[in-house]
Amino acid sequence: MASEILLNIKEEVTCPICLELLTEPLSLDCGHSFCQACITANHKESTLHQGERSCPLCRVSYQSENLRPNRHLANIAERLREVMLSPEEGQKVDRCARHGEKLLLFCQQHGNVICWLCERSQEHRGHSTFLVEEVAQKYQEKLQVALEMMRQKQQDAEKLEADVREEQASWKIQIENDKTNILAEFKQLRDILDCEESNELQNLEKEEENLLKTLAQSENDMVLQTQSMRVLIADLEHRLQGSVMELLQDVEGVIKRIKNVTLQKPKTFLNEKRRVFRAPDLKGMLQVFKELKEVQCYWAHVTLVPSHPSCTVISEDERQVRYQEQIHQPSVKVKYFCGVLGSPGFTSGKHYWEVDVSDKSAWILGVCVSLKCTANVPGIENYQPKNGYWVIGLQNANNYSAFQDAVPGTENYQPKNGNRRNKGLRNADNYSAFRDTFQPINDSWVTGLRNVDNYNAFQDAVKYSDFQDGSCSTPSAPLMVPLFMTICPKRVGVFLDCKACTVSFFNVTSNGCLIYKFSKCHFSYPVFPYFSPMICKLPMTLCSPSS
């Protein structure tokens, strides 16, 4: 209300020409008042153009001598100036930057607060203007809605910012993991190549050692042969240069010895018969390595289960087993093969575990069917798939074998009339019999292809008597298939596929090469891991994925 009163008063004491508070106001006959400077300037301008003097507002003529000072308006204008220049009033009311007046109006078209002089200017003429108090509530509500909307957008923006940071961190971790995996994969590839290089160099060193040793022996033989001939030549020269008696002394014996002299040629090595170095099949090696990586995805946590009676000792963490001699009866020979089962048993799915057999001279490992098998095996003849055992083993430090079923009908087979190959084929009612026919002991030295991609070299089957000291030619002894490996396994991987009915063994030491695979296994009961340290005091240890 006070603002409106001040506004009305200010309008009354404002010069219509300069639109400022009256300065030395002069009143005309018509009653309008103007600043002395403003009306004087207007008087000169109107006289110049029109030849007469008239009020700038109502155009009523006036005489210059009739202009009279208006002290009352001058006092009011002066008081208003004092109010406008008051610090308290200046703090309460914002003022127009152009006119210095209070900003009491709101222009809807421009959306700005203006003073009353701005409202009368050409810029805002015809615009809808309202008192600030009238529109403040309306725009306060609008701004409140806008504030809530912006706060929600700010929350959304902060969430998006957090999502971006989270995604950035996730990608960084993922890329770091990829870098780690790439470094690990290429390190493993380099390790494979380094291993192959080391093997090739070792083979060359062995070849060099054997070759030079043989040639050195040949050189010694040639030196002795040359010395012997020099002695004979010297004897002949002495006889020919000496007396008749010396010439004829034991002449027949000398001639006989000379005739018996045979020139021994040194043992040589033809270069074309040397083993030719071939670059490793990197593609094949990578395939083998890939297969090992695939089966290692099914790593199972296996622990060892003690058996009774037993000549084995299991560690506290149930991950290591070793042979222990029966101290209370040292003179009694063990009548069974000591072994332990692993836990858990498997009835479905794929499962993989690895066993450290470093430096052991004998061991047996694989899987067995629980209801058919026992941990302590009465005899070697029990290690057969038909008895529930699918195992491989090492004996005598370097003889690796896979234990297959004995072939029926072939134990006492004796070929006649040099026709053993054909007769063997007629009697081969399964692949085992067919395989056993093609052996060097049966005059067959062959390789073959089976089931499109299974290549085999046919070797003599190992007898049971070759496995253990003593003589045992029982017809039920297992067929022991020799396993030939360029690198002796220090770590063996076992992969059980219950659905495919297969048990596979991998040489982890040799970059995952397949050692042997049992196919078409019949698992009618839960299948358990099997371990036998044999009569070797060094332990067998279950490995962890990180070891």
Swiss-Prot record:
Disulfide bonds: none annotated. It holds the Pfam family zf-RING_UBOX. A zinc finger (B box-type) spans 91-132. Keywords: Acetylation, Antiviral defense, Autophagy, Coiled coil, Cytoplasm, Immunity, Innate immunity, Metal-binding, Nucleus, Phosphoprotein, Transferase, Ubl conjugation, Ubl conjugation pathway, Zinc, Zinc-finger. GO terms for molecular function: pattern recognition receptor activity; ubiquitin-protein transferase activity; zinc ion binding. Can form homodimers and homotrimers. In addition to lower-order dimerization, also exhibits a higher-order multimerization and both low- and high-order multimerizations are essential for its restriction activity. Interacts with BTBD1 and BTBD2. Interacts with PSMC4, PSMC5, PSMD7 and HSPA8/HSC70. Interacts (via B30.2/SPRY domain) with HSPA1A/B. Interacts with PSMC2, MAP3K7/TAK1, TAB2 and TAB3. Interacts with SQSTM1. Interacts with TRIM6 and TRIM34. Interacts with ULK1 (phosphorylated form), GABARAP, GABARAPL1, GABARAPL2, MAP1LC3A, MAP1LC3C and BECN1. Belongs to the TRIM/RBCC family. This is Tripartite motif-containing protein 5. It comes from Ateles geoffroyi (Black-handed spider monkey). The gene is TRIM5.
